[in-house]
Amino acid sequence: MYLYIETLKQRLDAINQLRVDRALAAMGPAFQQVYSLLPTLLHYHHPLMPGYLDGNVPKGICLYTPDETQRHYLNELELYRGMSVQDPPKGELPITGVYTMGSTSSVGQSCSSDLDIWVCHQSWLDSEERQLLQRKCSLLENWAASLGVEVSFFLIDENRFRHNESGSLGGEDCGSTQHILLLDEFYRTAVRLAGKRILWNMVPCDEEEHYDDYVMTLYAQGVLTPNEWLDLGGLSSLSAEEYFGASLWQLYKSIDSPYKAVLKTLLLEAYSWEYPNPRLLAKDIKQRLHDGEIVSFGLDPYCMMLERVTEYLTAIEDFTRLDLVRRCFYLKVCEKLSRERACVGWRRAVLSQLVSEWGWDEARLAMLDNRANWKIDQVREAHNELLDAMMQSYRNLIRFARRNNLSVSASPQDIGVLTRKLYAAFEALPGKVTLVNPQISPDLSEPNLTFIYVPPGRANRSGWYLYNRAPNIESIISHQPLEYNRYLNKLVAWAWFNGLLTSRTRLYIKGNGIVDLPKLQEMVADVSHHFPLRLPAPTPKALYSPCEIRHLAIIVNLEYDPTAAFRNQVVHFDFRKLDVFSFGENQNCLVGSVDLLYRNSWNEVRTLHFNGEQSMIEALKTILGKMHQDAAPPDSVEVFCYSQHLRGLIRTRVQQLVSECIELRLSSTRQETGRFKALRVSGQTWGLFFERLNVSVQKLENAIEFYGAISHNKLHGLSVQVETNHVKLPAVVDGFASEGIIQFFFEETQDENGFNIYILDESNRVEVYHHCEGSKEELVRDVSRFYSSSHDRFTYGSSFINFNLPQFYQIVKVDGREQVIPFRTKSIGNMPPANQDHDTPLLQQYFS
């Protein structure tokens, strides 16, 4: 037994050293420096070293002895900077070991690969010590980033996997969806930089079911010493639920980096195919280690993963995805075999052997090696192929779930995040801009883009067509358009967000008189200036929550501009009554079309189009409907206006209107419902009513309808009887009515059950509400607020409302006789009757 264990230790150490050497080979000096010094920086803690912070920061790695490179670094600090290095105290040190995991040291490591580092620590560290160690690791990440090396640290309690603890979707080890599978990946890819050897490798595969008992036997026999080994536990049996959750997580990752994740996704699919008796890849590698079969290029974990996936796809005769996964593997290795190299490294030798076995020709190699120059056609083809593969994996996963009657163990929150990200990335919806280049090609820019409009009645469907060439008849006719949409806004957004349209692109347009080149260039400049191409991926918190508009552009008069009719005409209007929504003698709306372009908190990009004189109303209702009442305000709201005339005025007015409506929408509360906004459009008045759950729009023909709508919204749901014809008014009201102003009369009911309202408009038309149970003060406040805002911001034609100050009265009895007094928040009995000389303004209280 002793000799067997010693032989295993020697094999382990040899393979570990091979992996360390491979990790450093062909990498730049910065990577080599970071990779070599990380153990030293974690073992020691000194102000002259990167990662230093005040406090009792845990330091010291068990069994650590500096190598030659690390000793040279320490000597330089002592010699040139006067640093006195003090070794941590003897005994069990807080850090059990430092390990890389993932593609590092495998054939899958490339010059752009990052480093995932597990810092395993003793379980006796308290929460403050763990926080300090985490902060130090964050500082070391920043130090590495300053050298151009991406490093991610993960603190791992040595008992984490024994206690079935899980991370969350915020990190690389993410999700309640992974536990044993995460340990499987660690065991097959880990490279020990410093600290204890990994105990799991010493337990034969046929003893896996009795892992703890076997380990205790080794300790009891004195074959192994407990404090020399990192023990994260055995690879117990896997549940179907864990496969399901882990596969969903891999699909989540594959959205942003499909070439990188497709191989892992298919490995999990292979595991599920073998369920309930899967052969975990880590166990396979360990078995070969114990048997002395150092195959697959030194038990390279990446090559062995490809080998297992190949075995699975061949067994189910899925040669389409097998070809795809081989291409993904080739691109991940990033060795361009079609180009001669003076030095043939081990990774190039491995890839050459595999490509020879696959029977690839030079043309295929050249095509793959030219990936950096792939343009939209190749990228879209690759995107569709990757999407098909991912959806096939998803369908197989669903079959697996049904076959095993799964009750998914992943937390509902995690599953919700995964599902929402899949939806945001892949769901095709009208107006949604599909992003086709998730790290497939670095540059999709086009030197020429042509937008062509086809009017109704032609052979081709009406709308806009986009071509990636200059408008040469021969070239246009002989090529399919890149994209089609009924509206120009969607095409410009698609070209911009997919990277085809850049500052260097020459633009051409055949707009059939609808849009000319200067207008197109202005729009492109506005969109590119206000919408950055790349944003951080949506956080799990954002995906937990309803999507919210983050960046919004309102594009006015792009495709239809009413002010174009002013050309060579004399237009009469009064600057004192200038209203862009109801302009001039004919009260024309100067907003003819509205396009919306917005990005939401899930990083979806959406477009919408509205046309005609009601386009502003429709666009407003749509924008506000997409903002739930508890949403955060958009980070930015921009108005792009492309009118030939009065551009600045229209843009300013639309900006004011949209900003005010957004504020009203997001500030409505349960305690203060019934806010409203009136808007005069083309001689007609519309009311926008802001309730907690929605925003409604109502056309208001006259003053009675208008104020009735306000009253209805304030008293909604109460017992209200309305009369409009043959109304018998109280004599005191009938005698008090006066044309030219709006009058509200409040009357207490005889049974003291609520109150009545009599509304007379400027023409003395009457509407009556009986037995109202709402608040008179709120009604007065809202009508007064409406008057104030309307007077400040709108100009209305004389045919609508004169907008003399609405008057509010209370009908009271004084000495047994009904009289009218001005309404106060607290009506005062026995107040002198109201002055009926309407040339003298009535005293009125405003509520703001």
Swiss-Prot record:
Catalytic, as annotated region: 1-535
Quote a single Gene Ontology cellular component term: cytoplasm
Q: Is the keyword Chaperone assigned to this protein?
A: no
Induction per the UniProt record: Repressed by the Crp-cAMP complex. Expression increases during growth, decreasing again in stationary phase; more strongly induced in an rnlA deletion mutant, levels remain high even in stationary phase (at protein level).
Describe what happens without this gene: Not essential, eliminates the NaCl sensitivity of an rnlA deletion mutant.
User: Which EC class heads this enzyme's classification?
Assistant: lyase
Localization terms from the record:
Cytoplasm
Question: Is-annotated flag, keyword ATP-binding?
Answer: yes
Per the record, residues carrying Phosphohistidine are 609
The UniProt annotation puts the region (Regulatory) at 541-848
Q: Per the database entry, which stretches of residues form a coiled coil?
A: none
Reactions it catalyzes? ATP = 3',5'-cyclic AMP + diphosphate
Which Gene Ontology biological process is one annotated for this entry?
Answer: cAMP biosynthetic process
Q: Which UniProt keywords apply?
A: ATP-binding, cAMP biosynthesis, Cytoplasm, Lyase, Nucleotide-binding, Phosphoprotein
Regulation of activity is described as: The regulatory domain is involved in the regulation of cyclase activity by the carbon source. Activated by the PTS system, glucose-specific IIA component (CRR).
Enzyme nomenclature, EC number: 4.6.1.1
- Domain of life of the organism encoding this protein: Bacteria
**In the record, what terms sit under GO molecular function?**
adenylate cyclase activity; ATP binding
| Pfam families attached to this UniProt entry | Adenyl_cycl_N, Adenylate_cycl
**Family assignment from sequence similarity:** Belongs to the adenylyl cyclase class-1 family.
Q: What does this protein do?
A: Catalyzes the formation of the second messenger cAMP from ATP. Its transcript is probably degraded by endoribonuclease LS (rnlA), decreasing cAMP levels and the negative regulator Crp-cAMP, which then induces its own transcription again.
Kindly give the NCBIfam families that the UniProt entry links to this protein: PRK09450.1-1, PRK09450.1-2, PRK09450.1-4
Q: What protein does this entry describe?
A: Adenylate cyclase
What organism is recorded for this protein? Escherichia coli (strain K12)
As recorded in Swiss-Prot or TrEMBL, the protein's gene is named: cyaA
